[in-house]
Every structure is written in structure tokens, then in C-alpha cells.
């Protein structure tokens, strides 16, 4: 009987945890973003991931930073890139390259303010085991 009570209690805790918001509820999730992984391989403690990322018109990456450097090229559409002080630090069009520094000091957001989909090819160079991006709260900007 004690085993049944413990199992019931465990099931209740698991069920309730599904209703509890995550600890990073103040983070700003992306919207309208899709990605296809082209390559994902670890070499010497560094994880290299190549992705094709599509952001729908009006979509964004959400506020975030990267544990490792990121390099990308716009293949279609237009990327508007903002720093954590809300300023636009670049508008990128097809054929233009973007590089993003790593770490908590480089919180940023990428937005598609155009009327057509934005497509980027992006290479992440991360420490193996780290996420590609870490979501953060909006730093106080009037958007997202």
C-alpha cells in the first residue's frame, strides 16, 4: 500500500509540474522561427552546428545570447538586428554576412520587419554541451 501511495504522489507531482511555468518565464521566446540542421559535429571540445533558419514576416528570435561565436549570411529577405540598448546595430540583406559575439554581455534580438520570409545560413561554434542560444528577458525595449 505504501508503494501505491508513493507512486500516486509521484504522479501528482509530475502532473502539477507540467502546469508550473518554467523558471525563465520572463524570457522572450522567438516567434515565427523555423530551423533545419544541416550539420552538427563536435571536434576537439567545440560543437559546430550549421543551420538554415527561416523567420516569418513579423517574427523574431526573441532576446538571447550565445555561449559561442556565431557567423551567418542572409540568403533571402532582410534581418534587423538590435543590441540590448534597443538600438539597431545592423540591417542585413541577401549576400551580407553577420557575426555575433558570445556571452552574457552580448544580448540581442533578430527581427524580420519585412513582408517576406527571412532565410539565414548560420554557423554556431559552441563549447560542446552548451545550448546554441540562451533566452533572456527583454532588456526594456518597447518591442518584443
Regions found by a protein language model. Give the residues of each.
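A short, N-terminal "cap"/entry segment at the start of jelly-roll beta-barrel domains
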Residues: 2-52, 90-91, 98-99, 131-144
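Short beta-strand/loop turn elements enriched in aromatics
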Residues: 40-42, 60-68
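Short acidic-glycine-tyrosine-enriched beta hairpin
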Residues: 43-47, 55-57, 79, 83-105
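Extracellular/periplasmic catalytic domains that process cell-envelope and extracellular macromolecules
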Residues: 65, 73, 90-91, 112-117
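Short, conserved beta-strand element in jelly-roll/cupin
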Residues: 67-81
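Ligand-binding loop in jelly-roll beta-barrel domains
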Residues: 104-131
Amino acid at each position: 500500500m505504501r508503494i501505491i501511495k508513493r507512486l500516486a504522489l509521484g504522479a501528482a507531482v509530475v502532473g502539477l509540474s507540467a502546469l508550473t511555468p518554467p523558471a525563465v518565464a520572463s524570457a522572450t521566446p522567438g516567434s515565427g522561427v523555423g530551423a533545419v540542421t544541416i550539420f552538427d559535429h563536435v571536434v576537439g571540445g567545440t560543437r559546430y552546428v550549421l543551420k538554415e533558419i527561416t523567420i516569418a514576416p513579423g517574427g523574431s528570435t526573441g532576446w538571447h545570447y550565445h555561449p559561442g561565436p556565431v557567423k551567418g549570411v542572409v540568403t533571402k529577405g532582410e534581418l534587423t538586428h538590435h543590441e540590448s540598448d534597443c538600438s539597431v546595430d545592423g540591417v542585413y540583406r541577401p549576400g551580407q554576412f553577420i557575426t555575433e559575439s558570445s556571452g552574457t554581455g552580448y544580448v540581442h534580438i533578430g527581427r524580420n520587419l519585412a513582408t517576406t520570409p527571412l532565410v539565414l545560413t548560420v554557423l554556431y561554434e559552441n563549447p560542446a554541451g552548451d545550448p546554441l542560444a540562451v533566452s533572456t528577458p527583454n532588456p526594456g525595449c518597447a518591442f518584443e
